[in-house]
Amino acid sequence: MKYYFSSIGIVGHPRYDSALNTHKLLHSWLVNKGYNVIIENKVAHKLRLKNINFDSLANIGKKCDLAIVVGGDGNMLCAARILSCYNIKIIGINRGNLGFLTDLNPDTAFQQLYNVLSGEYFIEKRFLLEVKIVKENGTALINTAINEVVLHAGHVAHMIDFEVYINNEFAFSQRSDGLIISTPTGSTGYSLSAGGPILVSSLEAMVLIPMFPHTLSSRPLVINSTSIVYLKFKKHIHSELKISCDSQVILPLNSKDNIFVKKSKKFLCLLHPKNYNYFNVLSSKLNWSKRF
C-alpha cells in the first residue's frame, strides 16, 4: 500500500460513549497500519490507552498531514478554525446529528477511510470569513468563521439599528434583531434556519440574512465573495451588542465600533471520498424527495 499520508491526527471532543469508542478503534486501526498517530490532548486522557502520542490541536496542525475529526459539525468547526492556519487536510467521521461536514458514516468509516488513505479522494477548499472590529481608540479584534458571522444583541428580542455598506457603497439600513453573514458552507446551517438560500459549496459568494427585520420588504442578499461588508451603528444604542463566529467565539461590541467582514485568506482543506456528491448530501441530510 502506498502511503499518501505519514502522520495523522485524531481530534474531536466526544460527548457519547459511541464516539469515544470510535476514537479508540480508529487509533488502533491506524497504528496497526503503520501510521504515526497523534491524538488531541483534550481527548487523550479519556481514551485511557497506553503509549499514545498526544499534542495540542495547533501542534497537530503543524506536525500532521491529515486530521480526522470524530464528531459532528460542531467538532469540525471548532477544530477547523485552528487547523485552517496550517497546511493540513481534514476529513470527518460523523458522530453528531446532521454532519454536513463529516463525510464518513461510522458504520462504514474504516472501509471508506482505507480507500481515502489509498489515494481514492479529492480535495475541496472552503473559504472562511474574517471579521474585524475596530474600536473607537483604533485597536482591533480579528477572528474567523467557517459558517457565519452573526451580529446580534446580548439579550433576546432587542432591535438593533444599523447600516450596511458593501465595498464602501451604502446598501441598506436595517432595524432588526441582527444580521447573519454566511459562507456557502454555512448556508445549510443557521442561515438556512433564518430563511437564507442554500449556496453550492464551491460558489464564490456570501449571503446576508436579516434576523427578524421590522419590515416586510427585507430579503436575503447574495454578494460576491470578494466584497467587503461594513456595518455602521446608529449612535447611542443602549442594547448590549455582540459578534458571534460560528456560535463558538463571541466578541463584545458597542455602538461606536466599526465592523468589517470579508473573505479570509485562510481555507479549510476538506478531503472527500471519490464518490462524494454534494447534492446527495443535501438530499440525505435535508430529507429531500428521492428520484422517480
UniProtKB/Swiss-Prot annotation:
Q: What organism is listed for this UniProt entry? A: Buchnera aphidicola subsp. Baizongia pistaciae (strain Bp)
- Broad class of enzyme this protein falls into: transferase
The Swiss-Prot or TrEMBL record lists the needed cofactor(s) as: a divalent metal cation
User: Which HAMAP family does the entry link to?
Assistant: NAD_kinase (MF_00361)
Name by which UniProt lists this protein: NAD kinase
Q: Which residues does the entry assign to the active site, renumbered to this chain?
A: 73
Per the record, a Pfam family?
NAD_kinase
- What is the annotated localization of this protein? Cytoplasm
* Broad class of the protein's primary localization: cytoplasm
What GO cellular component entries does it have? Answer: cytoplasm
The record's similarity note reads:
Belongs to the NAD kinase family.
- Look up the EC number in the record and give it: 2.7.1.23
Which key words are in the record? Answer: ATP-binding, Cytoplasm, Kinase, NAD, NADP, Nucleotide-binding, Transferase
Q: Which residues does NAD(+) bind?
A: 73-74, 147-148, 158, 175, 177, 188-193, 248
Q: What InterPro entries is this protein classified in?
A: ATP-NAD_kinase_N, ATP-NAD_kinase_PpnK-typ_C, NAD/diacylglycerol_kinase_sf, NADK
Q: What does this protein do?
A: Involved in the regulation of the intracellular balance of NAD and NADP, and is a key enzyme in the biosynthesis of NADP. Catalyzes specifically the phosphorylation on 2'-hydroxyl of the adenosine moiety of NAD to yield NADP.
Tell me one GO molecular function of this protein. ATP binding
**What Gene Ontology terms for biological process does this UniProt record contain?**
NAD metabolic process; NADP biosynthetic process
- Report which reactions are catalysed by this protein: NAD(+) + ATP = ADP + NADP(+) + H(+)
